[in-house]
Design a protein with these regions (language model features):
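Non-catalytic signal-transmission and effector/linker regions of two-component phosphorelay proteins
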Residues: 1-35, 137-151
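Conserved acidic carboxylate
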Residues: 38
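Two-component/phosphorelay signaling modules centered on CheY-like receiver
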Residues: 41-59
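Acidic, metal-coordinating helix/loop segments flanking the phosphotransfer/catalytic sites
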Residues: 60-78
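Acidic catalytic/metal-coordinating carboxylates
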Residues: 63, 89-92
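Short amphipathic alpha-helix used as the core "switch/output" element in two-component signaling
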Residues: 69, 91-103
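Alpha4 helix (beta4-alpha4-beta5 surface) of REC/receiver domains from two-component response regulators
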Residues: 92, 113-130, 141
Length: 151
């Protein structure tokens, strides 16, 4: 189980802003779908709030098994995966997601942020590894810079 040791500011705003033009409601396009795989409900909700505020469509789940079920029939543009999960590991999930979604941005995260874990995640297919607590500006930058076709 991963525990966030620091509060992360929650972004303000909405992923989809509404503007009224007489009786028509116009929704701005979503930047992309981001799978959030985090077993800690509080950490997961913070990530969902941040991603929503930045204009992404989060797909939150609590385990590797739930993640695979969630993307079975859906497109995914990026994933933020806690590498230490109950049941099947996040590192195993990263490998499977990379096979299925070769163009997706995969970010491994862990409270154990040592260089060996970063190398392991990258070796299994992650584009990036980030230690917890996550810095919102670093996460936003990683999502924006790693994949240009979906923003």
């Amino acid at each position: 189980m991963s525990i966030v040791n620091e509060e992360l500011p929650i972004a303000t705003g909405h992923a989809r802003s509404k503007t009224r033009d007489e009786d028509n409601v116009k929704l701005e396009p979503v930047r992309g779908t981001v799978l959030v795989v985090e077993d800690d409900p509080t950490s997961r909700e913070i990530l969902v709030e941040m991603l929503t505020g930045w204009g992404y469509e989060p797909m939150p789940v609590g385990s590797a098994e739930e993640a695979e079920f969630a993307v079975r029939n859906k497109r995914m543009d990026a994933a933020i995966v806690d590498v230490f999960l109950p049941g099947r590991s996040g590192t195993n999930l990263i490998t499977r997601l990379r096979e299925r979604f070769p163009q997706a941005v995969l970010i491994g995260v862990s409270a154990m942020s040592d260089p060996a874990m970063a190398r392991k995640c990258k070796g299994l297919g992650a584009d990036l590894f980030m230690g917890k607590p996550l810095m919102p500006e670093n996460l936003a930058s990683a999502l924006q810079s790693k994949h240009t076709s979906w923003h």
